Curated annotation (Swiss-Prot):
It comes from the Bacteria. It comes from Lactobacillus helveticus. This is Uncharacterized protein in hlv 5'region.
Length: 160
């Protein structure tokens, strides 16, 4: 939900401050719902050691450093799986996962599962770059296992 999301800081000065401070701070912010068609990349990772423990935080920023935000791995995964390019891969895999949960059909030899798997593979081949390589390799591993019930081995299935 975008109202629960952390604010996105606007401006290069806020980006420079965020590089050294991972806590929320006062600065010009904008709602995540208002930021559209901007590609973000991970700029910095903060891992906690010693008495302070927790999940790592990621500083994501736009290419021109106009927008920046600290986020968690769960939010990065959420945006990754819900991106427009991944939608064609994720939806057929969700259908297979739901079918296996409802009817205990986990084999890819099942006619419906095979159809959905082929649709996911077709969509994966339309992706670009390292994303395509990761998704296609994960799907090939899934096909080799011939079973969606194998957990812990396939990174792509962690989201389902």
């Amino acid at each position: 939900n975008s109202k629960d999301a952390d604010p996105i800081y606007v401006g290069k000065n806020n980006y420079k401050y965020a590089l050294t401070h991972y806590e929320t701070f006062k600065g010009k912010t904008i709602s995540p719902a208002k930021v559209q068609n901007v590609k973000f990349r991970v700029e910095k990772i903060v891992r906690f050691h010693g008495k302070i423990s927790g999940a790592p935080l990621y500083l994501v920023a736009s290419k021109d450093k106009k927008y920046s935000c600290w986020t968690t791995q769960a939010m990065l995964q959420y945006y990754y799986f819900n991106s427009k390019g991944m939608r064609g891969v994720v939806n057929p895999l969700k259908r297979i996962a739901n079918r296996s949960a409802d009817k205990n059909i986990i084999s890819l030899k099942n006619k419906q599962n095979k159809r959905d798997f082929n649709a996911a593979m077709k969509a994966a081949n339309k992706l670009k770059g390292s994303q395509k390589k990761f998704v296609v390799n994960s799907l090939k591993q899934l096909k080799k296992d011939n079973n969606i019930g194998v957990e812990g081995d396939n990174l792509l299935l962690f989201g389902f």
